[in-house]
Amino acid sequence: MRNCVSPLLFAWTKHLRLREFKIPFPNRLVVRSLNQLSVHHEKVTGCRPRQASSDELHKYSKSASNEAFLSSFAENQLFHKCLPSSAGAVLSENDLMYIIRKVSEVYADNKTEKVTVPFDKHKNPFLIYVKKRFAECFDKNPDLCLIVYSKLEVETLAKITPIWINVAKKNKKEDFLVELCLRFLERFRSCNLTEQAILYQNFRENWWSNIKLPQNLKSLYVELCLVYHFHNSHLGMDSSTVSNLKRFCFSESLGHIFAPLRFQNQQLPLQHVYAFLFSIAYRDNQVDTAHFLYKQWSRAGMGPLPKDAFIKFVQLLSKNRNWVLMRDIVQLEEYNSYLLDHRIVSAFLKPLSEKGNYKDILSLISVWQHSVWRPSLAYLQVVYSFSMRALLVNRQYSSAFAFFWKIDPYIRNERLVSQMLQAASQLHYHDLILYVINTYYSGNIMKNLGNKDLICITQSSPPCNISGIKPGSLKLSPTTNTVLAKSICYWLNDAMALLFLLENQLNCKHSLFQRKSLIILLNGILNCPHSSYDLQFRAVSLLTGRIRLNVDFEVSVLASQLVFFVKHRDFKRTLITMKAISKLQKNFDVRIWNYWLVALIQQKLYSRAVKVYSKLICSSAVRNDTTRSLIRLIPKSYFKSYPLLKESETEKKTNSAL
């Protein structure tokens, strides 16, 4: 026991005699030099002691020196010089540089080593003391701080920047914060790739998004961050950096909820980041932001944009009718492979179809066909069908009709012919429609209808011939079916003939007309100028027995029936129809609600009208001006039992405006 205790006491007393405790007392082993320091002791672990390496010795000695600095900082003359009690004391450039370097060393050691004096952000007296000195220096001499900051080494700059940012934020030094961020970004831009890798850790900090930076600094942050990832494309981007990019690219005034993004501890590749940013730009209609991101990618020499980002960019330009920039992009050879995507095709066709400029559409398709695509016949048919649909959606019916006849005959197909018939129906070319359907569609349609007038029309001189389509080779699609029913109603314009045709189709086992076409025939009978009430009621009764076939068909029939009874003031049958409609009230629009209200108000059933109006408010239908004018006809006394239905402030404003 004495052999163990006496050497231990001797080492402890020798350690206490040292004025500066640069080396803490070793545990379980007394050594005479650092080279004899072992990591594992034989008596404790049962293993042979391993000699410490040179790196471990360097870390040990450096950590010990920082511990001595921490333990004696209050007695140091440098810190004594700038105590709060010493009025008028100002730090020099060398003093400030010394503090910064010492803080960065202690900060670095604390992240890798367990030191005796813990470097705690809230409890460490040294850090509290230094933060006070930094805040005092920011207040009294901010120019000196910025000068010293610009002279720091890269590693020291990376360590001291978050500390200075936190101190400046806590003391509300907004101007100093902005200038500090500017100096950091300028320093980052002037560094090489190795130095940028050291400084880049500060790009991930959340304090960027908590500082009110001007727009030029936000743009500079985005530019430098993207350029760094352009040159280091193998590195992914973490969620905090993507969140900062989102905040700086898009204004908070647009109602963004800047929630923190989470990628499940994954690094997001740059192409996915760009697709994410372009999708936000498309959603918020931010053309300038998308153009800025596109320029950054082009300047970095990264080649073509990622496909998803490019598609969103072209769709955004199409939405804003920026045809000039779209034309410049399509001429770049690097995007040729993207132009086969149907979303790109529809985006390019949208601004042209809105103007009805079918000649430009033809020239664009011709350029793609000969220089870009080399496409197959099936794909060309899809492109032309897209073009026809775009013209029809924008109600450019004459352009769509003319566009069809400019298509090469070998490209025409059933879909294109059907779209041409839709345009012809809107232009009231009903004789052409009947001839084309009778000639180029299979099934002897006109003979099966059994109307002599229709047969005579189709046997007359043909108004046109569709080259590229064989007679009798097409099948009647649902769209063509409705076009045929509409043309028959316009051409015959006879309620008796239409009623005979409707009865014939309803009694036929294999009816030519579908449900929607039957509704068109019914409306044709109801709207004929020389029709009688008996004929119309007979037509309504014919379809009333078939309404259980389909819910949508039932709603359409009851809607036509309701309109018919209200127009003829047959309120008894109107009430019966309304009872049937009340079971399906979630499935019809505001027009039917308005007819229901008209019928009730005309019968002075105001209490029922108020109940219907309450159901209208709870439904998905949107009230219009007709609804508001009908409600004003109801006496206000009937709204007492429904206080929530009284005219709100918005309704009063609308009524006063009307």
From Swiss-Prot:
Subcellular location, principal: mitochondrion
One biological process term in Gene Ontology: mitochondrial gene expression
Knockout mutant characteristics: Impairs growth on galactose, leads to low viability on glucose containing G418, and leads to strongly sensitivity to antimycin A on glucose medium.
Transit peptide: 1-29
Keywords for this protein: Mitochondrion, Repeat, Transit peptide
PPR repeats: 130-164, 220-254
GO cellular component annotations of the record: mitochondrial matrix; mitochondrion
Compartments in which it is found: Mitochondrion
Biological function: Mitochondrial RNA-binding protein required for the stability of the atp6 mRNA.
Protein name: Pentatricopeptide repeat-containing protein 7, mitochondrial
Gene it is expressed from: ppr7
